Amino acid sequence: MSKIIGIDLGTTNSCVYVMEGKDPKCITNPEGGRTTPSVVAFTDKERLVGEIAKRQAVTNPTRTIFAIKRLMGRKFDSPEVDRWKEHSPYAIVKAPNGDAGVEVDGRTYSSPEISAMILAKLKADAEAYLGETVTEAVITVPAYFNDAQRQATKDAGRIAGLEVKRIINEPTAASLAYGADKKANEKIAVFDLGGGTFDISILEVGDNVVEVRATNGDTFLGGEDFDQRVINFLVEEFKKENGIDLSKDSMALQRLKEAAEKAKKDLSTSMETEVNLPFITADQNGPKHMLVKISRAKLESLVGDLVESTTEPCKKALADAGMTADQIDEVILVGGMTRMPLVQQVVGKFFGKEPNRSVNPDEVVAMGAAIQGGILSGDVKDVLLLDVTPLSLGIETMGGVFTRLIERNTTIPTRKSQVFTTASDNQPSVSIHVLQGERPMSADNMTLARFDLAGIPPAPRGVPQIEVSFDIDANGIVNVSAKDMGTGKEQSIKITASSGLSEEDIQKLVREAEAHATDDKKKQELIEARNHADSLIYGTEKSLADLGDKADAAVKSDIETKMADLRKLMEGEDAAAIKTATDELAKASHKLAEQLYQQQAQQTGAAGAQADAGAAEGQPQGNAADDVVDADYTEVKK
């Protein structure tokens, strides 16, 4: 049975863990990092993912996709997408289904498709570490993600070749990693402020049970917004000093983004930092450089309102849980932004206690996902995890009213039913409009699906009995059914296309991903073959130089011919031919090595014979001990 890996698919960085026995283990990437940047880049020749994609972003800003999680499950005309379009260097476009996608080189990619590229990279890293194929995963999402965003995440997993065994909320995963199930009857708040989202979850734990009582948050608040405030400040400072607006220069903005992120991190440990960007732009007078000092106080003044805005969801979550701040026993900080001293101060002040910083905020979510994988596979026993649905679910009723069937913060999985009737005489069918949200009117909430229940017998209004049932699984994904109680006719819908991708789309993308994985493998084999060949050529040339005239002319000529042939093949794309030619050169170089050893052996033998002859001409060899004379000594006293 293959391992179930735990993945934190983050806005800025992603992380993967796996259970080894009873302990979760972080899987590092080939670059040695414990987290991988959630960045995908397209060049003229290839697709790059992770650290290598991030490194080239400055020179390729319009084809480098970052923070794709902010577009997951969102419509193109949503206010959040409008906000992101203002700052995004890459093109955000409207997909045929109305979702927000990204366009690179004339092709439109959906957000699950880009996310799948990141997941495929994490999957490959896990397979390289484990030495076996990985097909199953637990993937985390912000607790406040709606159904469309959860489904988009699940689809991304499928495209990447992963069966997503469970979608788990990030704060819940963090509580598992913290060891909440081992605690004795505690009330815990998990404050999760990451790169793109904010969640607050209130949990009760004890006796191997982790129960989420309430959750709240903002799926469009995180480190990216903090970075943008710093970028805006730097742009304004440069404009004041030089009269040049950098906000329209995509390459300069990418450099500013990297500098802003670094400055923000530096100011978590230092009181002041310096942004030094030489040759940031140029005008008719020559190149321009940026040199700006930022203090921690200045950063806090720039982002203070963002930090304060996290307290309102905290109040709502506590109210929904029926608790007050002073009843919370422990506050756990999760997400890279919680390293910021101002965030820690605001959280400490709100809850009236020092936050717990014992867990690694960048890795704790992936660690918890791996533990959840262990629970599902049976490796981790005696832990019961009870999560909740973050948003209310219901249908549209007469007058455009949103009628809730399942209230927010209901423990999942769950099933609720309610009987409705017709609004007019002889109504032959009813249209079921499924919604998710907290607003009283349907138009203000998010549509999950629409379907019709037809074939209702003619009857006065109010007579037919239509039972509508909602079913939410452990992943927080919704199924809805409607049944005519009189005829027994039933219509149901599993809300699986809310990510914007049909089953046909997903299967097509799965095939593309598999083909790309094959291409990636071929590229890797070609690179390895070239590297091996290059190393062998270097070593062989060095050996020839060391031997000089001592090398056999025929062997030397054969080797030089084979090296020339191999160099020519290395310019091509045929890995198998390079490997064959490398083997041939290796065999020829072995002959050279044998010749070298034979010459050394002959020289050693000749030197030994001369030494023996010298010993024979000298005095006879006796026992060295015979020449040793014992000596007396006298102690001299001063």
Swiss-Prot record:
Coiled-coil spans in chain: none
Molecular-function GO terms, alphabetical: ATP binding; ATP-dependent protein folding chaperone; unfolded protein binding
Keyword Phosphoprotein annotated: yes
Induction description: By stress conditions e.g. heat shock.
InterPro entries assigned to the protein according to its UniProt record, in alphabetical order: ATPase_NBD (IPR043129), Chaperone_DnaK (IPR012725), Heat_shock_70_CS (IPR018181), HSP70_C_sf (IPR029048), HSP70_peptide-bd_sf (IPR029047), Hsp_70_fam (IPR013126)
Pfam families membership: HSP70 (PF00012)
Compositional bias of kind Acidic residues: 627-638
Record keywords: ATP-binding, Chaperone, Nucleotide-binding, Phosphoprotein, Stress response
Annotated stretches, region: Disordered: 597-638
Matching CDD domains: ASKHA_NBD_HSP70_DnaK-like
Positions of modified residues (Phosphothreonine): T197
Keyword NADP on entry: no
Compositionally biased residues, Low complexity: 598-622
Family the entry assigns: Belongs to the heat shock protein 70 family.
Annotated function: Acts as a chaperone.
The name this protein goes by in its record: Chaperone protein DnaK
Naturally occurring in which organism (per UniProt): Desulfovibrio desulfuricans (strain ATCC 27774 / DSM 6949 / MB)
